[in-house]
Swiss-Prot record:
It comes from Mus musculus. The chain crosses the membrane at residues 71-91, 105-125, 146-166, 173-193, 204-224, 236-256, 276-296. GO terms for molecular function: protein-membrane adaptor activity; ubiquitin-like ligase-substrate adaptor activity. This is Progestin and adipoQ receptor family member 3. It is found in: Golgi apparatus membrane. Residues 41-60 are annotated as: Required for interaction with SCAP. Keywords: Golgi apparatus, Membrane, Transmembrane, Transmembrane helix.
Length: 311
């Protein structure tokens, strides 16, 4: 029996000269970088552990095997359950205890819903990227990109709402601007041309622009509240900075393909840049959720100052 199991096992390398047998269900096999279709060849430093040429049923079944996508899938699947659980907890405990208004419930619901959609789109892509139909793979890739935009939208909606809580005019201006910008990017992402080679360099630029736009309302918010010496600025601005630092760190891992660039073939299953990007994405969204709850409680505990209300 033991020999039969070993015959059906795929041996993976976890560190130098350490090989471990991994059982793979019938109909699924793991491929090397040279064996996979061109559409999957994104990172030459990940040399093994690829799923490919699978029908939908086996794509779903591959959720429970160890491949180079396992951490990517489960990190955001668990991230989805994290934000789903936080949603229930917020609606039943956190918001009622803070005497939250109906608007607070709506904003927090939108924020967490966007985070959950972001997580699920990522899970869907990494689960079905091995589909035998390249068209199906590309559709899921487009949804993955769109999911990132939706996650960014969740950050903007909650951030703008509470930053300009006392400035209804500017709150509406920035919310409409952000919504229009995200919708434009969303429709571009689901267009077939977005995933072509011609757009390869433009895609990260678009994401950086959409994310970096948040600096404009942030600086405006600091000015409206009386500068960096204002208590709310000193309380909340560091949280915004931490979020951007996490996002920048995640993006640097994503584009640099570090650390596997320096250890090709050694980080196929654990510790690759894309896995770090995924974990940092969950950390960033969780941090922003906690910051949103913090500033919401702050807004309910302290009234709007007169010099802000009339601007």
């Amino acid at each position: 029996m033991h020999q039969k199991l070993l015959k059906s096992a795929h041996y993976i390398e976890l560190g130098s000269y350490q090989y471990w047998p991994v059982l793979v269900p019938r109909g699924i096999r793991l491929y090397t970088y040279e064996q996979i279709p061109v559409s999957l060849k994104d990172n030459p430093y990940i040399t093994d552990g690829y799923r490919a040429y699978l029908p939908s049923r086996l794509c779903i079944k591959s959720l429970f095997i160890l491949s180079n996508e396992t951490v990517n899938i489960w990190s955001h699947l668990l991230g989805f359950f994290l934000f789903f659980t936080l949603g229930i907890y917020d609606m039943t405990s956190v918001l009622p205890s803070a005497s939250a208004s109906r608007e607070d419930f709506v904003i927090c619901s939108i924020c967490l819903f966007c985070f959950q959609v972001c997580m699920l789109c990522s899970v869907g892509y990494h689960l079905f990227s091995c589909h035998r139909s390249e068209k199906t793979c590309r559709r899921w890739m487009a949804l993955d990109y769109a999911g990132i935009s939706i996650g960014i939208l969740g950050c903007y909606v909650s951030g703008v709402f509470y930053a300009f809580y006392c400035n209804n005019y500017w709150r509406q201006v920035y919310l409409i601007t952000v919504l229009a910008m995200i919708l434009a990017v969303f429709f571009a992402q689901i267009h077939p041309s977005y995933l072509t080679q011609q757009w390869q360099r433009l895609r990260p630029i678009i994401f950086c622009s959409v994310s970096g736009y948040g600096v404009i309302p942030t600086l405006h918010w600091v000015w409206l509240n009386g500068g960096v010496s204002a208590p709310i600025v000193q309380d909340f601005a560091p949280r915004v900075i931490v979020m951007y630092v996490i996002a920048l760190l995640a993006f640097l891992f994503y584009i640099s393909k570090v650390p596997e660039r320096y250890f090709p073939g050694q980080l196929n299953y654990l510790g690759s840049s894309h896995q770090i990007w995924h974990v940092l994405a969950v950390v960033m969204l969780y941090w922003w959720h906690q910051s949103t709850v913090y500033v919401m409680q702050y807004r309910h505990s302290k009234p709007c100052p007169d010099y802000v209300s009339h601007l």
